[in-house]
Amino acid sequence: MTIKISIDCMGGDHGPSVTIPAAISFVESEPDAELILVGLEETLLAELKKHKASEHPRLSIVNATEVVTMDDPLEIALRRKKDSSMRVAINLVKQGNADACVSAGNTGALMAISRYVLKTLPGVNRPAICSILPNQKDGPTYMLDLGANVDCEPQHLHQFALMGSALVSAMEGNPRPTVGLLNVGEEDIKGNEVVKQTAVLLRADHELGRLNFYGNVEGNDIFKGTTDIVVCDGFVGNVTLKASEGLGRFVKSVLTTEFKSSPLNMLGALIARGALKAISQRMNPSRYNGGSLLGLRGLVFKSHGGADAYGYQWAIKRAFDAAKYDVLTRISTKIADLMPQSAATPEDSAGAIPNATIEP
């Protein structure tokens, strides 16, 4: 079965210099993948020729005459740049010509255009960006929101928990994934009013058997693997994500410096080379690149804007796997079961522009 993924090749900090090599590497490693490269045709063709892949049978180009920059206001990206590579790539999903879309572009624009073109699933007020982080249990911790919604009300965090539960059930085959609410302490009295009110909603769902709510969790619980899912607003989630990425690079830098500081340390590094390589791979942020815009009527994945080709390839893989295992249908069914009485409010309608302005 061939899976078609549309790639917004112009998005991100590096554009085609990263997206094209990533696309080539992925399609060569995955025989069931077909990638649709969207962007300025001449630019994409030149990059493909540079990598001797202009005649690849599973790489095609769809021309788009405009580019959404990282600085474009939402209004311009959504209303004026109607032939942007981002919008064309998303439209391919809407039209059924692609099974999923990947972009490293402007987060706010990607969310706004995705909501406008694809609409949200029934019962979903706001989509959220969900991705995985590593934990001590050698498994994934799913975390949302990672930057789509800076300001949230309790009902939004409540829905994020339900959507995250649906995603993990579909991806991991776990019918009762545990949900933790990120807070400054485990006690019920801790946190701001939004978090406290969210906890009340989640406990009510837990008592009804609709959700497996663990309770409040702290930042260290993310990497301990205390719960399968960690829920927070997009501001907190994005800061947490960036801090963890920075810590990983810091630890790697310190280890490299120390092991090179003396002949004895260099010998120790040589002896521990296998273990150090494994640690480096587990802590490499690029391996966890690619967040799902959860809650849309189509599969859209957000790559980190500054990702290199290796990291972008992981984002493509996550989109490919989601399409391959029909995650959208499974999530839609699960959400319908979990949120039978939920309805979008007017201000959160599918075509509204969300308050997503930060870059995950």
Curated annotation (Swiss-Prot):
One of its GO terms (molecular function) is phosphate:acyl-[acyl carrier protein] acyltransferase activity. Its EC number is 2.3.1.274. Coiled coil: none annotated. Keywords: Cytoplasm, Lipid biosynthesis, Lipid metabolism, Phospholipid biosynthesis, Phospholipid metabolism, Transferase. It is found in: Cytoplasm. It is an enzyme of class 2 (transferase). Pathway: Lipid metabolism; phospholipid metabolism. Signal peptide: none annotated. The keyword Nucleotide-binding does not apply. It catalyses: a fatty acyl-[ACP] + phosphate = an acyl phosphate + holo-[ACP]. One of its GO terms (cellular component) is cytoplasm. GO terms for biological process: fatty acid biosynthetic process; phospholipid biosynthetic process. The keyword Cytoplasm applies. Its main location: cytoplasm. It comes from the Bacteria. HAMAP family: PlsX. PANTHER family: FATTY ACID/PHOSPHOLIPID SYNTHESIS PROTEIN PLSX, PHOSPHATE ACYLTRANSFERASE. Homodimer. Probably interacts with PlsY. Belongs to the PlsX family. Catalyzes the reversible formation of acyl-phosphate (acyl-PO(4)) from acyl-[acyl-carrier-protein] (acyl-ACP). This enzyme utilizes acyl-ACP as fatty acyl donor, but not acyl-CoA. This is Phosphate acyltransferase. The gene is plsX.
